[in-house]
């Protein structure tokens, strides 16, 4: 399957929004560099993200995050996802 979230998104309309249950961390997925099935096989697969945490003082920091660091991790929940993101996630599973 082709990568449905390969095109870059804006921080205000990301492909998905994830939050940590107990910490004040939020990840907004702006782009996936690889399709879900390819990302599953690559431990270095990355998302382009905007991240806000207690250490960013209310600002977004932009950068790459390993897929394995935020997908299917205990304590990190998907708060919102677009249909395209859920297609990517189904392909990843």
Briefly describe each language-model feature range:
Residues 34-35:
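Short, conserved beta-turn/loop elements at beta-strand boundaries and strand-helix junctions
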Residues 2-18, 25-28, 38-93:
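Charged interaction scaffolds used for protein-protein
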